[in-house]
């Protein structure tokens, strides 16, 4: 497929690359599956949501007169002409549910909040972020939306009705007057646009640029109106489904419309996300350790200037292929207590970098050290002067590790003891014994591996894949121990000379302990940038 695309004359155009990136992200994020899940959620929660809306409007006597008007506006803007029959059923259900007890009303509020939480989770998955705020904070935020939203909407309709009733605005001059029907449609469309923009800007836990949210909101609002118009025409001319479903014909049409709507809404989330990523430069993806140090260097520089660092600034130091991992990197820096979040949602330095070495920082991460091929790419695309010092030390560390590990595997296995077959009775081997056996195995591995990553709840070690879009989950069982942990475990079993292991480990520690993180970043101004002529890897 890629070979065919390269033959297209517009293959290198920016707009085509953006579309490829957008469609690829939508497929990779299982957009259609998320839309199907949200369709099912909407089907179960649409009556409770509308009931809550009507209950809040009924609680204010001044807004009682605009209940029916608001319901009609919602149905006409969100449903095509063929779905208005379903809207009558939904409205009847909501009217009957308005006479609930306090417990029933509370259950409706809980259902509404759970629906909004499900939508928020889908948006956050597209933005590659986790739920950072506590449950109480989210509940308070959504409770505010649920209660104030209908009140603001009802007040707007009251003001609109009052303006239309003014006598001087209804007078005709030379046969011309104000076409209120046209302006009502314009205002309704403007409210739809504002709703989509607010959705894309407010719901994700990431700080979405307002410009990108506005572009996505306008596109989705216009496409939504076109889709609603087209869907209504198709369904009105395609009547054979009524012969199949009979009285239930409105239900599959309604489900299909909700499914298409959620696909479009999630596509808008992808547009805002892709616009944010596409604004960065497309560079070769660096080793995660180098990306983390680059982010930490930015926070350190801003801290020295008495400033904090925003999420947008942290994302700006990453390349296009590195950006999908930015939130994971951010969590690593926070878990290592190197940075902390301010009340405004920005980040400042938390720990004195003179008191932490590169080796100590590396031991908290689930990544192996960079290898020569990755360092060659860094030297060719060096953007920060402190990399010159870092690359030299990594090259020396890899050279020494290669010397210590240059031993045939057959020679290692020659020291292994013959295995004895152990028969275990499944009737005697209980679940408690299995748990104890797993605990013993995990504690043995943790002693020779990275204790900070295993015991503090950090992510398991994973092999670095520069082309991977998202890092493996923290629950992944395919963890790989760092080379020194493997050798240490082998030395404990007697398969490798323990003196060789100690020598290798101590040498690596000394190489990285010589440089504190503050001393490393201080080379930004003094150390020269490595060029192709003085590359130590050549």
From Swiss-Prot:
NCBIfam families: yihY_not_rbn. Residues 427-538 are annotated as: Disordered. Keywords: Cell inner membrane, Cell membrane, Membrane, Transmembrane, Transmembrane helix. One of its GO terms (cellular component) is plasma membrane. Residues 482-493 have a biased composition (Low complexity). Belongs to the UPF0761 family. This is UPF0761 membrane protein PsycPRwf_0630. The chain crosses the membrane at residues 43-63, 100-120, 143-163, 183-203, 215-235, 247-267. It is a multi-pass membrane protein. InterPro entries: UPF0761_bac (IPR023679), Virul_fac_BrkB (IPR017039).
